């Protein structure tokens, strides 16, 4: 796992098409903005796991 330190307003670039920007910090939560092409799905982990479980149950 790559671990990076960023300040509010700074951005990470993943590949050629994805950017992740640190928008703010409030208490123990951070806000991130993610720009990615529509062909790339972006989900919170708990939502992704729920989607995968639903797909598995349909088989």
From Swiss-Prot:
Superkingdom assignment: Bacteria
One Gene Ontology cellular component annotation held by this UniProt entry: cytosol
One biological process term in Gene Ontology: mRNA catabolic process
GO MF annotations, alphabetized: mRNA 5'-UTR binding
Keyword field: Activator, Cytoplasm, Repressor, RNA-binding, Translation regulation
Keyword Repressor: yes
Main location class: cytoplasm
Subcellular localization, as worded in the UniProt entry: Cytoplasm
InterPro entries per the UniProt record, alphabetical: CsrA, CsrA_sf
Pfam assignment, any one: CsrA
Entries under NCBIfam families matching the protein: csrA, PRK01712.1
Function: A key translational regulator that binds mRNA to regulate translation initiation and/or mRNA stability. Mediates global changes in gene expression, shifting from rapid growth to stress survival by linking envelope stress, the stringent response and the catabolite repression systems. Usually binds in the 5'-UTR; binding at or near the Shine-Dalgarno sequence prevents ribosome-binding, repressing translation, binding elsewhere in the 5'-UTR can activate translation and/or stabilize the mRNA. Its function is antagonized by small RNA(s).
Quaternary structure, from the entry: Homodimer; the beta-strands of each monomer intercalate to form a hydrophobic core, while the alpha-helices form wings that extend away from the core.
Family: Belongs to the CsrA/RsmA family.
UniProt protein name: Translational regulator CsrA
Organism: Buchnera aphidicola subsp. Cinara cedri (strain Cc)
Lineage: Bacteria, Pseudomonadati, Pseudomonadota, Gammaproteobacteria, Enterobacterales
Gene (name only): csrA
């Amino acid at each position: 796992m790559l671990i990076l330190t960023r300040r509010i307003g700074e951005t990470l670039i993943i590949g050629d098409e994805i950017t992740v920007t640190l928008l703010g910090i409030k208490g123990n939560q951070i806000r991130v903005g993610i720009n990615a092409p529509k062909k790339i799905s972006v989900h919170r982990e708990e939502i992704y796991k729920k989607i995968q479980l639903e797909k598995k149950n349909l088989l």
